[in-house]
């Protein structure tokens, strides 16, 4: 490995694992994939300790960093639910001897990754074909991703700069679109009170949909995990298959609503841990029909691309993109 002259340490910090890599902001492909490493969070007492261990392992000293964290960034600190680390930007920068350290939300990183995605990093799920655009062309993109929760964000590109939209769109109220979905909403309302999109479109959401369908059928499904539902659907179980179909259709409806709310006419990127697992279902389900079914805007919506992100390290890619964009920032400008 040949280290760049001014390496930037990038990280993607989740609840269980921490991923690190180096980025070269002057390279045409900034993320140096061969430098990526993954460590268990529980093996280190702090983010700084994990980052120092990584740098020592690869024998490189960086002075700048961009760390994406799966939680809310509030000033100097980032908080991740049920996480052993208290993440402080200033303390971590001091421990590592960094002159600059950015903490960003993990979904801001997913949005920033769009600016570096290549055609081979995505799979078309419908709409017009997509090609990466030069950074000086204005673009509005949406990004939505089911995992343990539902992340929703966007990316605005203007005048050669990238501006991620950090939202809590996963917590918007769920809008049922069919009588069956109305009944599911009624059942989930009895359990949760208010029902957000995240109650259905995420890993636990698969279980919620399946349990609601089981209640409608008058049966008890017993203990379930999301992986049980996808496995049963693959084996031909009708209720599990219907769960996946509903998941994809509702996902499409919500993604389409996001386009209308954000003006994300240039494309929607589907990310998160569940997307690769249900990709075939997304391509052969009601996802696009519900995505496009927006009344007077249906014709326009039919042209909006929806793309599944298949890059194995999209969070690291987004952190690298943030580092690249920071180099374009005029002196004294605040994000």
UniProtKB/Swiss-Prot annotation:
Residue spans crossing the bilayer: none
The principal localisation class reads: cytoplasm
Q: What CDD domains does this protein map onto?
A: ASKHA_NBD_GLK
Question: Transferase: present as a keyword of the record?
Answer: yes
Question: At which positions is ATP bound?
Answer: 11-16
GO terms (BP aspect): glycolytic process
Compartmental location? Cytoplasm
UniProt-recorded Gene Ontology molecular function terms = ATP binding; D-glucose binding; glucokinase activity
Keyword line: ATP-binding, Cytoplasm, Glycolysis, Kinase, Nucleotide-binding, Transferase
Does the UniProt entry include the keyword Repressor?
A: no
Q: Which HAMAP family match?
A: Glucokinase (MF_00524)
Q: Which NCBIfam families does the annotation name?
A: glk
Family recorded in the similarity comment? Belongs to the bacterial glucokinase family.
**Could you tell me what this protein is called?**
Glucokinase
UniProt organism field: Xanthomonas oryzae pv. oryzae (strain KACC10331 / KXO85)
């Amino acid at each position: 490995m040949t280290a760049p002259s001014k390496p930037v340490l990038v990280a993607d910090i989740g609840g269980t694992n921490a991923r690190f890599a180096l980025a070269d902001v002057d390279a045409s492909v900034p993320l140096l994939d061969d430098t990526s490493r993954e460590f268990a969070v529980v093996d280190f007492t702090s983010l700084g300790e994990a980052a120092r261990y990584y740098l020592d392992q690869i024998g490189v000293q960086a002075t700048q960093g961009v760390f994406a964290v799966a939680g809310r960034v509030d000033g100097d600190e980032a908080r991740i639910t049920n996480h052993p680390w208290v993440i402080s930007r200033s303390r971590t920068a001091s421990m590592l001897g960094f002159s600059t350290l950015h903490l960003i939300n993990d979904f801001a990183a997913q949005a920033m990754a769009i600016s570096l995605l290549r055609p081979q990093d995505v799979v078309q799920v419908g709409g017009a074909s997509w090609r990466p655009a030069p950074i000086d062309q204005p673009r509005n993109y949406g990004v939505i991703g089911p995992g343990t929760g539902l992340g929703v964000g966007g990316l605005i590109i203007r005048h050669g700069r990238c501006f991620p939209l950090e939202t809590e769109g996963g917590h918007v109220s769920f809008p049922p679109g069919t009588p069956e979905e109305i009944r599911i909403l009624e059942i989930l309302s009895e359990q949760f009170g208010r029902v957000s999109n995240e109650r259905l479109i995420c890993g636990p959401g698969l279980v919620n949909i399946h349990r609601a369908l089981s209640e409608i059928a008058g049966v008890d499904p017993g203990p379930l995990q999301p992986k049980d539902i996808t496995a049963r659907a693959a084996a031909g179980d009708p209720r599990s298959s219907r769960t996946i179909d509903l998941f994809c259709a509702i996902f499409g409806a919500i993604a389409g609503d996001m386009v209308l709310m954000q003006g994300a006419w240039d494309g929607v990127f589907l990310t998160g841990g569940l997307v690769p697992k249900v990709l075939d279902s997304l391509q052969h389900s009601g996802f696009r029909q519900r995505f496009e079914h927006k009344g007077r805007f249906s014709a326009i919506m039919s042209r909006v691309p929806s793309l599944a992100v298949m890059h194995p390290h999209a969070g690291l890619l987004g952190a690298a993109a943030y580092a690249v964009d920071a180099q374009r920032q005029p002196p004294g400008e605040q994000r």
